[in-house]
Amino acid sequence: MGLFDRIKRVVSSNLNDLVNKAEDPEKMLEQAILEMQEDLVQLRQGVAQAIAAQKRSEKQYNDAQNEINKWQRNAQLALQKGDENLARQALERKKTYTDTSAALKASLDTQSTQVETLKRNLIQLESKISEAKTKKEMLKARITTAKAQEQLQGMVRGMNTSSAMSAFERMEEKVLMQESRAQALGELAGADLETQFAQLEGGSDVDDELAALKAQMLPPATPVTQAQLPPQQETTPAKSNEVVDAELDSLRKQLDQL
């Protein structure tokens, strides 16, 4: 396939169709870009050569026009001098350059059309290369994203979500148990302290009640006269002491039973 046929094929191609049909779109685009860049180099060389040929044809055409004008003037000059034969030769030379000029003009028109076509193809090829590079970068980004999503989905599928949730629930249950245990220990510590103070208060009440009971059991005090005082040698009757001791023993037994 010639250069111009390849360029025509590339310029008229649809990159989206090429990508969709390719087994490896990224590799296909990379190869297409390389081929288009090679074609671009050749096309630029071809455009440069065509422009150079066009310039040569333009110069030859202009030179032929100058010769036509020159021999036209020479023919007129010969006629003015009365030399008709010389004028005829000048006109024959003019005709030769006129034929050459016509051929050069036709060739120049064809070259101009070809150069314009090559320039358009060059612009389109550069645009295709830019489009291919952009699609390549977009495709690479999509491939990277797709691979990341696939990897993430694989990780999610590999995870046992129910087992993980059960583990979290067990951890939460342990934390709640520890919190409840700490709260219960705090309440017990407070209860023990209150019990100790209650025992202290209760002990004080018992002591007070015992003292009051003793005071009630003592005989009331009566005025003592000198006549009523027993002799110094006498002591308190033993019977009164026995009664008090018996009552105290009874009281102790009652307290022990509490």
From Swiss-Prot:
This protein's domain notes: A helical hairpin is formed by residues 25-137 which is conserved in all known ESCRT-III proteins. Helix 5N-5C (residues 193-217) contacts the helical hairpin 3 subunits away and is essential for oligomerization. The C-terminal flexible linker and alpha-helix 6 (residues 220-256) are not required for oligomerization and do not resolve in electron microscopy.
Pfam families referenced in this protein's UniProt entry, alphabetically: PspA_IM30
GO MF assignments: lipid binding
Name of the protein described by the UniProt record: Membrane-associated protein Vipp1
Family: Belongs to the PspA/Vipp/IM30 family.
GO cellular component: plasma membrane
Localization per Swiss-Prot or TrEMBL: Cell inner membrane
Region (Disordered): 217-258
Subunit-level organization: Polymerizes to form rings, filaments and ribbons. Rings are formed by stacked rungs that tilt to give a dome-shaped curvature. Rings form with symmetries ranging from C11 (55 subunits) to C17 (119 subunits).
Species annotation: Nostoc punctiforme (strain ATCC 29133 / PCC 73102)
Annotated keywords: Cell inner membrane, Cell membrane, Lipid-binding, Membrane
Stretches with biased composition (Basic and acidic residues): 249-258
